[in-house]
Amino acid sequence: MFKSVLYIGLSWVLVCFAQPDISTLASVICCMCGYGLLWRGLLSLVDSSSWRKIWCLAFFWTWSVEGFHFSWMLEDFYVGTSIYFVWCLLISYLAVTFASFSCLVVLCFRKQYWGALFWLPGVWVAIESVRYYGLLSGVSFDFIGWPLAATAYGRQFGSFFGWAGQSFVVIATNLGCCSVLVFRKSFSYGLWLVCCAFPYFLGGTYYEYVRRHFSNEEVLRVAIVQPGYSPHMQGARTASAIWSNLVSLCQGICPPVDVIVFPEVSVPFGLHRQAYSFHENQQVLESLVPNKFWNEFFTNLDWIRALSERFQCAVIMGMERWEDKNGVMHLYNAAECLSLQGEVTSYDKRILVPGGEYIPGGKFGFSLCKAFFPEFALPFQRLPGEKSGIVQITERIKAGISICYEETFGYAILPYKRQKADILVNLTNDGWYPHSRLPLVHFYHGVLRNQELGMPCIRACHTGVSAAVDSLGRIVGVLPWESKTCPVCPDVLQVSVPVYSYPTIYAKFGDAPLLFVAVSSVLGVVGYFLKRRGKTLTGSDI
């Protein structure tokens, strides 16, 4: 009993702190044995406890771990107390799935179903794929393989097999750990050590190969604007005051610069609404572009053109876009890019946040929301975008744009590599969960795309992590972000980002190979149990 408590308690500590933003050491150790210790502890209880008790123990273990991992969601200052209900539903779903999988693992060890154990890493990938692709807009945060992102070599392993490959190898390694603790055979030790080393060896080998061939010859000169507004602060300001602050920040930019990047929904009113008067903004306008003629009323596009004219560069800015469809107003979360030649390209966010940007469940979901959470009953419908976000920044450099947590989905960003984008651009706003871990959690999930696809990235955020990262996941420049101990300050990050890119297996095949493995594994484990059941029935007949 003591060993069971020790194994389960130690596994809880390791997995809880196995977050790249919290502890690199715990993340590495967790990938090796964190879950294996849990399964060994549960296996020790099989003789003295019912399967129901074992499942409940695994459920509460997972519930508490996931509750800690998603604790940033409980910052309710802006999103309201209803977020507790959403948080509880999410971690309960995750706990049910992992507790059930853990019982399957324990059963296979207990009954010595070695053939079934072979399929289990793929089975887990299939389980995670359901929430990654099918749970509302998808839940990409905190997949089992995420602790590998704590090291450069672990992240680089994703360039072969993506998030699914990372989860696969972590489950396989921990199954090896459990077999070591159960059998203590030399073969088990060898298999476990091979699994431990495999992702770091493969990822590290390719990382060092790319690093030796890395080139800084071609760069993109970027100015990333971090306004430093929380959602509440921005809502209390007039649109003219917001622009006055943005222009003031931009005055510190030193030419030459190729592109100025602003965060998600930096200004209100969309691109073409004449919401500004020359008289009210004359002083700011003349400081930005002297001797320029302005109409009495002008738009956000006019502001952006003035910035582009002043700094002779492209400008990318997040804002909302309204569209009237059959008499009904629809809203898009958009990114607007103005090239140096004056061409405007729009990109609409394709993966929307449930609750914040749309109400799941159609009319039925809206009715429930209006009855129980009226403050979240949206008066308009926000639509997902339908087209790719490739924009031309300079004559030679194209960017692939994502908004908010779209960057955490490899399948959503993968087409940009195939469409010959040179750099990734993410516009986001983590200010809805102030003073929480979210900025770093979001950043570490997003930076995986750099090494998965072999592409650099620039991120513009209001209060989160505004940074430039090269194609090997190395931070070229970063601004301070908001945390519990550090308030955020308005600033501009001006940096030259190498646009060196390289081919990856994931960029060529995406998630398809591991999804094939996942489906095959589910069929394999079902076939295994059906075959054993058939043998059992045949034996009983004899």
Curated annotation (Swiss-Prot):
Report the SUPFAM superfamilies cross-referenced here: Carbon-nitrogen hydrolase
- Compartment annotation: Cell inner membrane
Q: In which domain of life is the source organism classified?
A: Bacteria
PROSITE patterns per record? CN_HYDROLASE
Domain CN hydrolase as annotated: residue spans: 220-499
> Which class of enzymes does this protein belong to?
transferase
Q: Which GO terms describe its molecular function?
A: N-acyltransferase activity
| Gene Ontology biological process terms, A to Z | lipoprotein biosynthetic process
Chief localization class? membrane
Q: Which membrane topology term applies here? A: Multi-pass membrane protein
Q: Which UniProt keywords apply?
A: Acyltransferase, Cell inner membrane, Cell membrane, Membrane, Transferase, Transmembrane, Transmembrane helix
Q: Name one GO cellular component term.
A: plasma membrane
Its pathway, per UniProt, is:
Protein modification; lipoprotein biosynthesis (N-acyl transfer)
Is Transmembrane helix included in the keywords of this UniProt record?
Answer: yes
Q: Does the keyword Transmembrane helix apply?
A: yes
- Which InterPro entries does the record associate with it? Apolipo_AcylTrfase, C-N_Hydrolase, C-N_Hydrolase_sf, LNT_N
| List of catalytic residues | 264 (proton acceptor), 349, 404 (nucleophile)
**Enzyme Commission designation:** 2.3.1.269
**Transmembrane region positions?**
26-46, 54-74, 89-109, 113-133, 163-183, 187-207, 509-529
Return the Pfam families for the record.
Answer: CN_hydrolase, LNT_N
Sequence similarity:
Belongs to the CN hydrolase family. Apolipoprotein N-acyltransferase subfamily.
Function, as annotated, reads: Catalyzes the phospholipid dependent N-acylation of the N-terminal cysteine of apolipoprotein, the last step in lipoprotein maturation.
Q: What is this protein called?
A: Apolipoprotein N-acyltransferase
**Originating gene:** lnt
